[in-house]
Amino acid sequence: MQRKPRKNLTRPRKKTAKTRNLRRDGKQLKSNLETYCYDQLKEFDIDFVYEGETFIIQDGFRYPGIYYKSTKGKDFMMNATGNAVLQVKYTPDFVSHKDKFIIETKGYVPSQHTFPIRWKMFLKYLVDNGMDDYMLFIPKNKKQVDETIQTICRELKKSK
């Protein structure tokens, strides 16, 4: 009795989108979605800066107590007592202080495990620093970028 060939039980890997020319106005953009958003903001003559500002959402510090941490690829823990804990920074994709908006494009990113907590910390930073009147957008595709641009244009017309 012959056996049937086994099916491949592993999932096929999703292919990431091929990147084309991602250079605009001398700036190297990181994804097709960022490029599309950049082009749309320019087309609608909306004032913005691309990755022009980095926010420090938590200052660095030194932990005064005993601190051991695991080491990559080794079986033992390393003594990190007294070592500096680095600051936590966040750089949004598009910022406009004039029009009060921040856009963070998030396409298909398989392992952005730090983004959700970093984003929550950033929201707290905005509230604590009197920037809670900014419009925030996290579009994941071109349709959502279009919706983002429409919302910004609509809000700018209201304020004039």
Regions found by a protein language model. Name each.
Residues 1-160:
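Electrostatic, structured charged patches in enzyme active sites and in nucleic-acid/phosphate-binding
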